[in-house]
Regions:
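Short amphipathic alpha-helical segments
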Residues: 10-14, 18, 64, 208, ...
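Elongated, acidic membrane-bridging lipid-handling scaffolds
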Residues: 24, 67, 109-215
Length: 219
């Protein structure tokens, strides 16, 4: 009975613990709706994460993620003898906002140590991150007409973020991603970088094709 009670109560305890940590994020505040645990495979799911700006009247959240799953990377544990995790973000949204002259109405992510916030959600280091069907948007609600530029259907991956694998003596992490710009123009991006540096050396490639400029006429 004790084990059953612990099994039932633990997700609520974890959720309350995380919400307590995310309540104080500098200029932002986070909240989680629910947590599901799968201890037998070293994984847990976060449902309904939302991060909003504390000051200013910004009409959209900075981050909204219906589902996030973190799990121990058994491949890295078995082959590289490293205890690291993989993250899977499903349909996440990020909204950047230009508030114009009203700086309080802007939303850029400044004012918070985001690496520290990620450490609150996950006690071990992330080595791989996958983003499935995400969206990145830029808004200006004060301009006339209003600006709304977005990349949808964002599918991307970050690999080797902790340098578990050295590639020919180099400490290379890499990023690969695809999306649709303004809902129709294929966008591709890839990068390599040293995850332990301050991005002093990195290579980034970006390409967008077949963008219909008439879609930008309103701006």
């Amino acid at each position: 009975l004790v084990l059953i009670a612990v099994h039932i109560a633990l997700p609520y305890l974890v959720r309350n613990y995380l919400n307590d940590k995310l309540a104080n994020m500098g200029d932002y505040r986070g909240e989680i709706a629910d947590v599901d645990l799968a201890l037998w495979r070293g994984a847990y799911r976060i449902n309904g994460l939302q991060i909003v700006k504390v000051d200013g009247k910004v009409p959209v959240p900075f981050v909204k993620a219906p589902l996030i799953e973190f799990a121990v990377s058994w491949h890295s544990l078995w082959y590289d003898h490293a205890v690291v995790a993989e993250g899977h973000f499903v349909r996440p949204q990020i909204n950047f906002v230009d508030g114009g002259a009203n700086k309080q109405a802007s939303q850029t992510g400044k004012g918070t140590d985001w690496q520290e916030q990620l450490r609150k959600l996950l006690p071990i280091t992330l080595n791989e991150v996958r983003i499935e069907d995400g969206e990145i948007a830029f808004h200006n609600f004060s301009s006339k007409p209003q600006v709304n530029i977005n990349a949808t259907a964002v599918n991307a991956s970050f690999y080797n973020l902790t340098n578990v694998v050295d590639v020919k003596g180099k400490r290379d992490a890499r990023f690969e991603g695809k999306a649709l710009l303004q809902g129709q123009a294929p966008l591709e991006a890839n990068a390599t970088f040293d995850p332990l540096s301050d991005f002093e050396e990195f290579e980034f490639r970006f390409r967008a094709r077949d963008l219909q400029l008439k879609r930008m006429n309103d701006f």
